[in-house]
């Protein structure tokens, strides 16, 4: 449910993993995009250059997409999850496994995506799974080797999803720690913005390494306060996702941060302006607000997240944010 880059890439993975005869329905919000995907076997809007297998059928009709579906992958942006689910909930089959692909914390409620799914649909939390990891859609669509985490409190559902996704190039690992898997995914986008900002003002690898490492410390503090396992955040859904998103030129969050570091304004970048924006969703811009609020509610200190929030929403320059961080009181690691 969602024909963006990640939703489209995972639809391809499912068909490739399932082999001949496997069929996946891909819901697109815009009818013209669904028609284009079916006609051209490609998604030029979100995943240009990728040939899609014939087992993928796109539709803009949610009823058609969800009819008799026993596994539903929810690939809409985090802040749009609730509104979409409110429309889709009556169409869901009883007992279906609902899988969140979104990485973010809902503004206002400060809920993780699995909590939003349960809140809206009323399903048993054991029916809800999360897929998260170092998964840049363009690389996976190109069949480059990658790994991910399938987290669910129901081990049977986790293993079933693992089998559905296990292809020659995409390797899923199961995990019962839904909280840790979601926190790693939500927070890493914020740290990637910080890495991009540093690169944009011309800072080098030492700075990037410090941001990634201290960013991980923030993520660990928040995750553990929420009941996550440290091992989860040291794995693919934590360190793995953080490194990929902070380092890759394909990362929208890092790229946006880099443009901010070069002097673009947040408004112009998000609007898809000549400053370099592409108009696609960049979760970290919203996540820095909701993650910071969630951390405050648990009395967890997250200075990097706070600095990113100040740049994105309070008008602070990147240079001023760096000075603020470097001026903090020194302390043991």
Curated annotation (Swiss-Prot):
Catalytic activity: sn-glycerol 3-phosphate + NAD(+) = dihydroxyacetone phosphate + NADH + H(+); sn-glycerol 3-phosphate + NADP(+) = dihydroxyacetone phosphate + NADPH + H(+)
Annotated GO biological process: carbohydrate metabolic process; glycerol-3-phosphate biosynthetic process; glycerol-3-phosphate catabolic process; glycerophospholipid metabolic process; phospholipid biosynthetic process
Keywords, alphabetical: Cytoplasm, Lipid biosynthesis, Lipid metabolism, NAD, NADP, Nucleotide-binding, Oxidoreductase, Phospholipid biosynthesis, Phospholipid metabolism
Pathway(s) this gene product operates in, as recorded in its UniProt entry: Membrane lipid metabolism; glycerophospholipid metabolism
Active site residues according to the UniProt entry: 188 (proton acceptor)
Enzyme kind, highest EC tier: oxidoreductase
Lineage top rank: taxon: Bacteria
Cellular component terms per the entry's GO annotation: cytosol
Entry binding sites for NADPH: 6, 29-30, 103, 137, 252, 281, 283
Alphabetical list of Pfam families matching this protein: NAD_Gly3P_dh_C (PF07479), NAD_Gly3P_dh_N (PF01210)
GO MF annotation list: glycerol-3-phosphate dehydrogenase [NAD(P)+] activity; NAD binding
EC number(s) reported in the record: 1.1.1.94
Binding site for sn-glycerol 3-phosphate: 103, 133, 188, 241, 251-253
InterPro entries the UniProt entry points to: 6-PGluconate_DH-like_C_sf (IPR008927), 6PGD_dom2 (IPR013328), G3P_DH_NAD-dep (IPR006168), G3P_DH_NAD-dep_C (IPR006109), G3P_DH_NAD-dep_N (IPR011128), NAD(P)-bd_dom_sf (IPR036291)
Positions in coiled-coil regions: none
Subcellular location: Cytoplasm
Its job: Catalyzes the reduction of the glycolytic intermediate dihydroxyacetone phosphate (DHAP) to sn-glycerol 3-phosphate (G3P), the key precursor for phospholipid synthesis.
HAMAP family given in the database record: NAD_Glyc3P_dehydrog (MF_00394)
PANTHER family: GLYCEROL-3-PHOSPHATE DEHYDROGENASE, GLYCEROL-3-PHOSPHATE DEHYDROGENASE [NAD(+)] 2, CHLOROPLASTIC
Similarity comment: Belongs to the NAD-dependent glycerol-3-phosphate dehydrogenase family.
Name under which the protein is recorded: Glycerol-3-phosphate dehydrogenase [NAD(P)+] 1
């Amino acid at each position: 449910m969602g024909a963006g880059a990640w939703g489209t890439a995972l639809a391809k993975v499912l068909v490739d993993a399932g082999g001949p005869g496997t069929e996946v329905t891909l819901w697109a919000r815009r009818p013209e995009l669904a028609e284009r995907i079916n006609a051209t076997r490609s998604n030029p809007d979100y995943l240009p250059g990728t040939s899609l297998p014939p087992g993928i059928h796109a539709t803009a009709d949610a009823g058609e997409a969800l009819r008799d579906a026993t596994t539903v992958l929810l690939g809409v942006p985090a802040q749009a999850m609730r509104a979409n689910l409110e429309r889709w909930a009556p169409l869901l089959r009883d007992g279906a496994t609902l899988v969140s692909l979104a990485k973010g914390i809902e503004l206002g409620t400060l809920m993780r995506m699995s909590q939003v799914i349960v809140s809206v649909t009323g399903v048993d939390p054991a029916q809800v799974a999360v897929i998260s990891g170092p998964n840049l859609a363009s690389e996976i669509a190109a069949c480059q080797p990658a790994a991910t985490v399938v987290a669910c409190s129901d081990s049977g559902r986790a293993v079933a999803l693992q089998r559905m996704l296990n292809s020659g190039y995409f390797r899923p690992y199961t995990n019962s720690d839904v909280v840790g898997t979601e926190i790693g995914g939500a927070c890493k986008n914020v740290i990637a913005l910080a890495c991009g900002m540093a690169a944009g003002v011309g800072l080098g690898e030492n700075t990037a390494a410090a941001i990634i490492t201290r960013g991980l410390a923030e993520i660990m503090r928040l995750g553990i306060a929420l009941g996550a396992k440290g091992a989860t955040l040291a794995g693919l859904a934590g360190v793995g996702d953080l490194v990929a998103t902070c380092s890759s030129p394909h990362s929208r969050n890092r790229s946006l941060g880099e443009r901010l570091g070069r002097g673009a304004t947040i408004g112009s970048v998000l609007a898809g302006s000549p400053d370099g924006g592409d108009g696609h969703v960049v979760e970290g811009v919203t996540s820095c607000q909701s993650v910071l609020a969630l951390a405050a509610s648990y009395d967890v200190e997250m200075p990097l997240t706070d600095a990113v929030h100040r740049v994105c929403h309070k008008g602070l320059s990147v240079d001023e944010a760096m000075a603020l961080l470097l001026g903090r009181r020194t302390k043991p690691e």
